[in-house]
């Protein structure tokens, strides 16, 4: 199946709506040949037209051009995308649970509509009728928006910010992963120089934040796998954070402990001693067979042992990640993983849906052995979380996620992950340290934004570190002027 779009300056919306039905269909720039399987969408001078062809069967739809936008009409691209969606929904018999919505932040959309003065009835119509969103997904997004409102008031206070620190090292690469990360065994010599640079960047961030008059709200150390650092390197990094920031005023300090094959009692003790208030231990699954298949070098028992060590070290706010749709997983084994996580009684459980990243081994080696019809059934099992007293508190979506589904953070009341909410709803500045870091500067209630990018790869980050520090001066400049300097990537 190929995608061919013509007559528009950009076919972005059409392409991504087609991929709700055919996730891996390539976009072609030349018209399909006669008899070739394809979805063809075209804006013609006198109207819109869409066609789908598979084998010897074909269907098509047409519609007049929309009224001009200034007269209240839709854009031609959205109208063509809607026409194509309606055709493919009838053709395949599939109703995507989020309908025509391709955006990654549906909860943010609810916040924006409320802020713009829309009535709840108008918002309901927007989601359910215009975008064909299912009642179940919309009600979940709406409940999350309600829960987030008081938390967003804290995070959206003028000149508040969160600090993100990235550790791009892992003991091994998971098959579903496309993030920039380095193999610890291969790149071990790079780790200490990287940590040294990272500590200096943290100090520069504090200086720039002070110049701009910013107040730190939350801290998140993520990866990669932060516990791929040694205990001494964690002390060095977290000690630098403690020396440069008043942690007593921080509402949340998260460290992704991540994988049990590099997280031990000493590291867990260091993380607690140096001020972290929340950690994440991420099993992804409790099936040994699935763990082996995705390239994890540990067992389900290792996860249980790591969790017990974390509790022993005094960690009282723990998140656990699970992924629905991993190769080799089934509805039954996913339910087992979910029940196992609930039995451990962590404060947070985050359920991700597998995303098909083109740079991941799953896609490169075509390991997509699930037919994905079971993925929605896996997520239906999340009712077990609600029954156990957890409630959804943040939600986001990604391109090429199986069945156009979502990632949802669940928590016990009072244990919402503040940083997760702030970064997803884009209400505050995020100052990022480390390779691949993307600093996002926010002012005027989100009306003005700017990004400053760090170099993507750790070796380049180290070699060109002077440029990293120079770019950070754009933080204070952004708040001193109407427009900050542009940052090249």
Segments from the language model and where they lie:
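Canonical Radical SAM [4Fe-4S] cluster-binding loop centered on the CxxxCxxC motif
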Residues: 158-195
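Radical SAM enzyme core and accessory elements
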Residues: 1-108, 112-116, 120, 413-489
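A C-terminal junction/extension of Radical SAM enzymes
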Residues: 35-36, 355, 359-433
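Amphipathic, soluble alpha/beta structural segments
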Residues: 214-215, 219-223, 233, 401-407, ...
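Conserved non-cysteine loop/helix-boundary elements of the Radical SAM core domain that shape
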Residues: 181-380
């Amino acid at each position: 199946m190929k995608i061919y779009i013509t007559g528009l300056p950009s076919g972005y919306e059409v392409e991504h709506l087609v991929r709700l039905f055919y996730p891996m269909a390539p976009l072609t720039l030349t018209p399909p040949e006669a008899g070739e399987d394809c979805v063809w969408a075209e804006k013609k001078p006198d109207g819109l037209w869409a066609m789908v062809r598979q084998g010897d069967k074909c269907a098509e739809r047409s519609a007049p051009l929309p009224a001009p936008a200034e007269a209240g009409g839709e854009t031609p691209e959205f109208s063509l995308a809607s026409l194509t969606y309606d055709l493919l929904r009838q053709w395949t018999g599939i109703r995507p649970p989020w309908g025509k919505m391709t955006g990654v932040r549906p909860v943010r959309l609810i916040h924006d509509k409320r802020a713009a003065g829309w009535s709840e009835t108008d918002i309901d119509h927007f989601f359910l009728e215009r975008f064909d969103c299912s009642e179940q997904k919309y009600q979940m997004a709406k409940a999350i928006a309600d829960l987030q409102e008081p938390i967003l008031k804290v995070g959206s206070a003028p000149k508040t910010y969160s600090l993100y620190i990235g550790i791009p090292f892992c003991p091994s690469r998971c098959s579903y992963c496309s993030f920039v990360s380095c193999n610890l065994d291969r790149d071990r010599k790079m780790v200490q120089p990287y940590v040294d640079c990272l500590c200096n960047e943290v100090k520069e961030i504090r200086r720039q934040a002070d110049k701009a008059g910013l107040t730190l709200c939350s801290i998140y150390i993520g990866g990669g796998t932060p516990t791929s650092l040694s205990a001494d390197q964690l002390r060095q990094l977290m000690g630098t954070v403690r020396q440069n920031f008043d942690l007593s005023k921080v509402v949340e300090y998260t460290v992704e402990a991540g994988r049990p094959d590099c997280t031990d009692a000493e590291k867990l003790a260091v993380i607690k001693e140096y001020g972290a208030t929340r950690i994440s231990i991420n099993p992804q699954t409790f099936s040994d067979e699935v763990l082996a298949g995705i390239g994890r070098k540990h067992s389900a028992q290792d996860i249980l042992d790591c969790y017990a060590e974390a509790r022993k070290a005094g960690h009282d706010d723990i998140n656990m990640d699970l992924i629905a749709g991993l190769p080799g997983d089934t509805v039954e084994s996913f339910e087992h993983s979910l029940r196992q996580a609930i039995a451990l009684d962590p404060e947070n459980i985050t359920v991700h849906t597998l995303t098909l990243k083109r740079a991941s081994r799953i896609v490169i080696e075509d390991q997509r052995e699930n037919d994905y019809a079971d993925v929605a059934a896996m997520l239906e099992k999340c009712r077990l979380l609600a029954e156990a007293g957890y409630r959804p508190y943040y939600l986001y979506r990604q391109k090429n996620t199986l069945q156009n589904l979502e990632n949802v953070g669940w928590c016990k009341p009072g244990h919402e992950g503040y940083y997760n909410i702030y970064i997803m709803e884009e209400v505050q500045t995020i100052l990022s340290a480390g390779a691949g870091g993307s600093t996002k500067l926010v002012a005027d209630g989100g009306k003005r934004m700017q990004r400053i990018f760090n170099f993507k790869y750790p070796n380049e980050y180290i070699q060109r570190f002077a440029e990293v520090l120079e770019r950070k001066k754009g933080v204070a400049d952004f708040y001193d002027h109407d427009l900050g300097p542009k940052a090249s990537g």
